[in-house]
C-alpha cells in the first residue's frame, strides 16, 4: 500500500522543511520514495504541490497521513479529485 506522507529535509537542529512524498507503507520515514509530489515549509507557511501527481496516486488508492490530508484539504485537492470522478 502506498501512502502520501512527509519526509524531513534540511540540516539537523534547524527549522524543519518537509517534502511530500509517495512511499510504500513498510518503508521508514527517510526511506526511498516512489515519487516526490510536493514541498511544505511550516515556518514560512509555503506549500508547493504537484497536483496531477497527487491526484494520480489518490486515484490509485494511496492514503494520505493526517498532516498531509490537512495540507491537501487546505489546498483544495480533494475537490479536484471529486470533479475528475
From Swiss-Prot:
One of its GO terms (molecular function) is structural constituent of ribosome. It comes from the Eukaryota. GO terms for cellular component: chloroplast; ribonucleoprotein complex; ribosome. Keywords: Chloroplast, Plastid, Ribonucleoprotein, Ribosomal protein. It is found in: Plastid, Chloroplast. One of its GO terms (biological process) is translation. InterPro entries: Ribosomal_bS16, Ribosomal_bS16_CS, Ribosomal_bS16_dom_sf. PROSITE patterns: RIBOSOMAL_S16 (PS00732). NCBIfam families: S16. Belongs to the bacterial ribosomal protein bS16 family. This is Small ribosomal subunit protein bS16c. The lineage of its organism: Eukaryota, Viridiplantae, Streptophyta, Embryophyta, Tracheophyta.
Amino acid at each position: 500500500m502506498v501512502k502520501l506522507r512527509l519526509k524531513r529535509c534540511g540540516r539537523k537542529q534547524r527549522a524543519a522543511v518537509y517534502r511530500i512524498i509517495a512511499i510504500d507503507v513498510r518503508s521508514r520515514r527517510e526511506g526511498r520514495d516512489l515519487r516526490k509530489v510536493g514541498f511544505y515549509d511550516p515556518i514560512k507557511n509555503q506549500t508547493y504541490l504537484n497536483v496531477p501527481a497527487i491526484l494520480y496516486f489518490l486515484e490509485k488508492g494511496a492514503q494520505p497521513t493526517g498532516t498531509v490530508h490537512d495540507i491537501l484539504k487546505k489546498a483544495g485537492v480533494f475537490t479536484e479529485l471529486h470533479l475528475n470522478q
